[in-house]
Amino acid sequence: MCHVIVTCRSMLWTLLSIVAAFSELIAFLSTDWLVGFPRAPDAGFSPLGATAAGEAYRPTLGIYGRCIRVPHYRRGVLCGPYAVHFGEIASGFWQATAIFLAAGILLLCAVAFISIFTMCFQSIMKKSIFNVCGLLQAIAGLFLIVGLVLYPAGWGSQKVQLYCGPDSSPYRLGLCSAGWAFYTALAGTVLCFLCAVFSAQAEIATSSDKVQEEIQEGKSLICLL
């Protein structure tokens, strides 16, 4: 018999797991990892910003995509991938970053999907589904940390220097600033580890004596708030 068990801690863990997965996915797909120095739409490198060529703007660069302003372009800003193939990503460090982040995000999305069904199923192969998911989240967090540590090592690539100036180098941004996607990825990584720790509390909440009493009474829907 399937028992639907809902507790504050289990629902909070499910919600946080989904938020962690989506925050990492959105950050990975975004072009706002780096915000370049101000320049005119058709100007070259000039730390002075605006020129007679047009109003100054700041292009953005992601792991595999970018946003630039194109003169006479109807939409003003053109966003899309600069790398058609994996080998065209700005540097080997960013290629490694993409691999580790993708692996971590894949695990987080799998856990987020599974977490939705933890109200009905609390074990898998005689193992607590919360503990298994918590372990997967911890592994995903390690992948994310490795990816985020490798990411700044690619700041010395030629592609980054086009956006950040010639002074940019590994772990030095030059004229760029970190965009919201980078900070979102950092926050998602921290949240990932919090979810891994909190999964133990979700397991305790769904296997408490109060829950067992409700099951013995024959209830199929158990809601403990």
Swiss-Prot record:
Spans traversing the lipid bilayer: 11-31, 99-119, 129-149, 178-198
Topology within the bilayer: Multi-pass membrane protein
Q: Which InterPro entries match?
A: LHFPL
An annotated GO cellular component:
membrane
Q: Name the source's superkingdom.
A: Eukaryota
Q: Sorted alphabetically, which Pfam families does this protein's record hold?
A: L_HMGIC_fpl
The GO biological-process annotations, alphabetized, read as: development of primary female sexual characteristics; development of primary male sexual characteristics; positive regulation of fertilization; single fertilization
Q: Does the keyword Transmembrane apply?
A: yes
Q: Where in the cell is it found?
A: Membrane
Give the primary localization class.
membrane
Q: Which UniProt keywords apply?
A: Fertilization, Membrane, Transmembrane, Transmembrane helix
User: What function does the entry list?
Assistant: Plays a role in fertility. Involved in distal reproductive tract development.
Record's family? Belongs to the LHFP family.
Stated name of the protein: LHFPL tetraspan subfamily member 2a protein
**Species annotation:** Danio rerio
